[in-house]
Amino acid sequence: MEEALKENIMGALEQVVDPELGVDIVNLGLVYDVDMDEDGLTHITMTLTSMGCPLAPIIVDEVKKALADLPEVKDTEVHIVWNPPWTRDKMSRYAKIALGIQ
């Protein structure tokens, strides 16, 4: 996948905000990998802040909606993984500031 396309996808994913934390999933460090096959099927590998997150279906739907606006994306599969586990260390500086974490 071209780097420019990957950047566009990550930019679209920055519009997906974790409803509990109010920060986007990219800056939270929840997106682990982005890939697209030759047919435009996009694979998003991501995690959530906790295994019991009741908002997982909402976040997955928001990811699909955000990517539907990109002409290269024909469909999206979201793969939720728990390994490696998410930690605050994965958050961007922006996310840490927004959440008051040092």
Swiss-Prot record:
Signal peptide: none annotated. It comes from the Bacteria. InterPro entries: Fe-S_Maturation_MIP18, FSCA_dom_sf, MIP18-like. Belongs to the MIP18 family. Involved in the maturation of iron-sulfur (Fe-S) proteins. May function as a Fe-S cluster carrier. PANTHER family: FE-S PROTEIN MATURATION AUXILIARY FACTOR YITW. This is Fe-S protein maturation auxiliary factor YitW. It comes from Bacillus subtilis (strain 168). The lineage of its organism: Bacteria, Bacillati, Bacillota, Bacilli, Bacillales.
